[in-house]
Every structure is written in C-alpha cells, then in structure tokens.
Amino acid sequence: MSSNEAYHEPGAGGDGPGGSSGASGGGSQRSNQLHHQQILNETTYLKPAAKQAYFSDEKVLIPDDDSTNVGFSFRKLWAFTGPGFLMSIAYLDPGNIESDMQSGAAAKYKILWVLLWATVLGLLMQRLAARLGVVTGLHLAEMCYRQYKRLPRWILWIMIEIAIIGSDMQEVIGTAIAIYLLSNKVVPLWGGVLITIVDTFTFLFLDKYGLRKLEFLFGTLITIMAVSFGYEYIVSAPNQGEVLEGMFVPWCSNCNSNVLLQAVGVVGAVIMPHNLYLHSALVKSRDIDRRQTKKVSEANFYFFIEASVALFVSFIINLFVVAVFAHGMYGKTNNDVVEVCKDKSMYEDAKMSFVDNVNGTAIIDADLYKGGLFLGCTFGAVAMYIWGVGILAAGQSSTMTGTYAGQFSMEGFLNLQWPRWCRVLVTRCIAIIPTFCLAMFSKMEDLTSMNDILNAVMSLQLPFAAIPTIAFTSCAAIMGEFVNGLGNKIVSILLTIVVIGVNLYFVVVQVENMEIKGGLLALVCIFAILYILFNLYLVIHMAACMGNQRLMNSRWVQRFVLPSQNSFSIKNANSTYARIATSSDQEPEGLAGEDA
C-alpha cells in the first residue's frame, strides 16, 4: 500500500475506534481491515510524498530537554523557529507595503493603532491554524478534503486559488517596479514582469539544499526589508511622540471617509486568507510525537511564541513604512513634491508621476514607484535604491511563500500532487499574462492602481479560510482535548465577524467607485447572492462542528453538509486525529497486497 493512500477519501462503512467490531471470523477480519483503513486515511503520521512541498525530504528534530527539567528552552524555541517567519512574509508583501504608504500619506499616524490591532487579530487566527496542523498532523486544505462535500470543497479550492493568484499578481507588480527603479529605468516594467518568471524557478530549487537553509534564506530577506525600511525611517526622523500616540490611542479625530477607507484597507491587506492554509502546513515540518499530549502542548506553545515574535517584526517593518510616508507626504500636494525634486536628477520623472490638478491642490496618491521617487528627491538617490532593494526583497520572499501556499492548496483540496515547477508555471503564467499586458500597454499608474482591485478580491476570500479554521479547531472530534474552549470560540467568531464585515465594506466601496452598470451590475448581484449563500453553508457546517445537536440531527444537514462515508467525522466524537498513533509505514496482517 502506497504512502499516498493516506490522502485518499475514506471508503464507506469504516468503523471508528468506538464502533462495533462486527461478527467473528471473516467479519472480524473485515472489521480490522476497515479500522486499519481509517487509520491510513486519518493518521497523524503522514508519510511525505515524493513531490510534497517544503518538507518532503526532511523534518526538523526537536531536542529533548525533559531530563534537565528546564521550564523554557531556547534550544527548543530555535528548533521550532521557521514556520512563523515564513508565515509573516505575507504581512510584508508589496500589497501591504503600498497600503502602508497610502495610510501614512492619507492619515499620518492616526491609524497606526489599526495596523497594530489588525496584526494582533492576524496572530490570533494564525494561532488557530498552527494548532490545527500541530494537533492533527493535517493542514487546513487536507482537513477540508475530509470534512466537506465534493462541490463545496471545489468551490473553496477555487476561491483560495483566486486569492493566491491575486497575491501573486501583487508580488509580480512589486518586483517589476523594484527592478525598474534599481536599473534606473533600463529594464522596462514589462521586462521586470518577465524576469519574475526566471527568478521564481531559481528560488524553487533552493529548498533542495535543506529545510533549515531555506528558512535561513527567508530570514535573510526579512532582515533586508528591516534594514532597508529601517534606514528610511532613520533618515526621515519622524516625531516619535506622534508615532507612539498613533499606535496606542484608538481614535481618529477629523478623519474623513477617505481615511476610513484606508483604515479598512489596512485590515484587508494584513489578514490574508491563503496565509492560514500556509501556516497550518508549515508547522508539519517539525518532528512532533502526537501520541504524547505533553509534546503537542509544547509544540503549540513554542509555535505561538515564534509566530508572536515574527509578527512583531513584521509590525515594526510596516510601522517604518507608514511613519516615513506619514512624515513626508501627509498634507502635501503633487506640486509640493515636484518642487522638492526641482534640482534632482529624477525631476522629469517626478513631473510625469506627480501630476497636479488645475488648482494645484491634488493630494498625493501614493504608490510604490512614487514612493521611490519621493525618497530619492528628499533624501538622495541612495534612499531610492535602498527602497528598491526592500521592495525587491518583499516581492521575492512573497513569491516563494505564495508558491508553497498554492502547492499545499492543490495537494490538500484535490488530493493532487504536481511537481513544484509545473505548479509555479501555471500559477505564475495566470498572474503574469494580465500584468504583462498592463505593463506593456498602460501607464505606471494603471499598474500600481491594480493593487486596490486585488486587495478587494482577496478581501472577498477571507471567509473561506477563517470559517473552516474556526470550525475545525472548535470540533472536539478533530482536536480532542485541544479543542477551542467556549471563550476562545466566542472571541474567534466575534473577531472573524468584525474582520469579514470590515473587508466586505472595503469591497462594496471599491465596487461603487468602479461605477458598474447594466449587465455587469446584474452579474455582480448574482455573484453577491451566491457568495452569501455559500458563506451561510460554511456557517451551518461550523455550527455543526461546534456541537449543535439540532443541526447534526437534521436530515438535510446530514445529507448536504456533514461528511459522509467517513469513519472519522464530526458525528463520531470518539475518533480524534490527535490520539491516533499508528504509522502508515507498517502493513497489518491480512491487508498485505490488498488495494484498500
């Protein structure tokens, strides 16, 4: 029996650990076969397939310090360090950097507290995703494969793929703009878009050199971003008192609708749907003995500390960007920036980019390219090139983690494993074709303004990651003793409602700004109805996961919502992934050579 059978959808009639054993003789043997098939289908010890992303060749061993009776071990923390920092890169992609710029230019430091609390909310959601992977040994997409019917599972996969491709387009745009700046416009935007194809495949082969070396590379890219944007923060020297006030005073006096929209955009940019799928899979790279409750608790503890540190670093980097452009661009018009650039080499570029209206009162609409020009005019060419290096690091690191997220999504939802190069070729081509056309035939403004549309698209996908995460981590049959408590459930649901509501508001405003009419408006309305209905379906499933007996006993819910023909399901509370301790490497007696 191949190791890939651990991914097959369970067949009918399998008995859980608490189920009946059947008759003696042949019935008993068949019962044992079915019980073993359940273990193969739902084991926490998944033998990595040859093409599985990220951790196919090795797992990081966790040092055993139990004999020394050490309460907190930095050796163990170091062993668990890696997945959280890879996850945090999604908080630092070019779309986030541009959102930081725009919020600083529009509201100065007034909505820094929104960035802070959005990061905290993101941490709480990432904690749930990581716990799911640690406790069950299955990541979020693999769990969706087991817990949803075929049609909703496919819809979920399509939605997450849209989010991944949207994020990939932002990364392509950011990388192309960075190359354009660093090459002093020698490499055109469309050339930078094409270069992203080549460099992505180059990076894909780096994980062949070892898991820890790959994680070190990601850490290096984060360090480059911290140094680059930290340099800009130091040379711009914003008022530290105002920065602290903006962080810790949750208020925004004299803020107009544009500032409110920027605040909503910050939340939408920070909390990325595909990142929950990514993080739940990355934690599987550590060798954790799930048969021991103590080891699982320990892993949850150290992963949470690591994620907290990683997101703290990402928050500081985002803070640097907001503060730099809040200090330099807030309240200024395009003409003000052009005046600053008057005696600089980038004066002509500034005149073409910072175009003012007739009255000379147009407020700056910040984007990645304009940010580089502004820094170059204000602090010299070195500042512009350092900005370009930071954006390049953001684009490259996000590209790689996006590739892994796509690989995990495809492996989990479809039980399909493609080689990484094939997966990247398909995703990257889908992202590059529209981006290349814009870069080839449109202006820089069209390329950068696409980020707003992409942020709106990704905001729509958030429920398709948040609701399954809360549902599975709140299900006792899945999480065992690690299930969310009542307080955790209430807080998670309330926070998710707030975040999803904020994101939907952002989407509605963006759609209104597009002034959609006629047949296209009718299509948008139909999509909105289907979108609401599917979210309602996911909420019903979540309520059943949380133990709502009325829903679980409903024939309609049993037929259309709950997993069927699955010995492990939310209907079988005696069977938990956390307590299965059988390796799929061993074939039990009576099953050798049998195709289960």
UniProtKB/Swiss-Prot annotation:
GO MF annotation: an example: manganese ion transmembrane transporter activity
Family, similarity comment: Belongs to the NRAMP family.
Membrane topology value: Multi-pass membrane protein
Comp. bias intervals (Gly residues): 11-28
Ranges that cross the membrane: 77-97, 105-125, 154-174, 186-206, 216-236, 263-283, 309-329, 373-393, 424-444, 463-483, 490-510, 520-540
Protein known as: Protein Malvolio
Principal localisation: membrane
Signal peptide (UniProt feature, chain positions): none
Source species of the chain: Drosophila melanogaster (Fruit fly)
Swiss-Prot/TrEMBL keywords: Glycoprotein, Membrane, Transmembrane, Transmembrane helix, Transport
Lineage top rank: taxon: Eukaryota
GO CC annotations, alphabetized: endosome; endosome membrane; membrane; plasma membrane
Single Gene Ontology BP annotation: copper ion import
Further details from the record: 'Malvolio' is a character in Shakespeare's twelfth night, who 'taste(d) with distempered appetite'.
Tissue: Expressed in macrophages and in the nervous system.
Region listing for Disordered, in residue ranges: 1-34
Compartmental location: Membrane
Sites carrying sugar chains: 41, 359, 574
A Pfam cross-reference name: Nramp
Function, as annotated: Putative transporter required for normal taste behavior. May be a nitrite/nitrate transporter.
Cystines in this chain: none
